[in-house]
Structure formats: C-alpha cells, structure tokens
Amino acid sequence: MTMSWPEYFMGFARHAASKSKDPSTQVGAVAVGPDGEIRATGYNGLPRGVEDRPERMERPAKYLWTSHAEENLVAHAARVGVSLKGCTVYVTHYPCSRCARSLIQAGVSKIAVGDGTTSMPAEEFETAKVMFAESGVAVEP
C-alpha cells in the first residue's frame, strides 16, 4: 500500500526532528507549497553559528538557547528568499503560541500536526488554537 501525501510529508517532518540534539524533545517541521513542493524544513536547536554545547540543550538552559522547529523553518525560508504564503506546514508537535504567531505572520494557510507531545503549559496550545482560528489558518490532526 502506498502512503498518502500527508503521511509522506509528515515523514519528512519526523526526519527533520531527528537532527535535533535536544535529549528530551525532538520537533521537526516541513513547509509544503500548493503544488506539493517542499519549500523549507526546520527542527528545534541552537541558532545558526552558535557553539553547540551539550549543556545548552539541558533544562532549564535550553529555553534560553534554542529555537523551535517552526521558528527555524520560518527563519530559514526568509534567509533564502522563499515565501511560505499559502503553504501547509507539517509539524511533529502542536505549535506553541510563539510559533503560531510566526507561522501566521509568514502566511502559512494550514498546519498538519503529528502526534508528538511536550511538557509546555496547556495555555500555550489553547492560545495557539485561538490564534489559528481567528487568523483563518486551518489545523488538521
């Protein structure tokens, strides 16, 4: 049996997550254009050029040092001049409110969410859900 396109793209997001050096949470994201083309990927990790030290990936330091997968995806697309307008973003975990803001501002039209879980407060996700709904960004499980 052949996998569906959504399964295929979520597989890319999971593959991107495998690049994360975070010992407890690996998140990946992939932006797919309206014609099914992959436009950008991202995973949670240190910013480009920042020294990669293991202690920076441990709690609570990682909250100060790391960027979320969705933030890295948006930043990488901007860095190389790729528009995310109208894209679907496949992400392994539900976006937090900060990442929701970035995705909305980048013009993403749909979020496809994997089954990953995090220890972030529930209010993060509730706020993100409201922002997605109010801004017209569709969310699919």
Regions found by a protein language model. Name each.
Residues 1-141:
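Zinc-dependent deaminase catalytic domain
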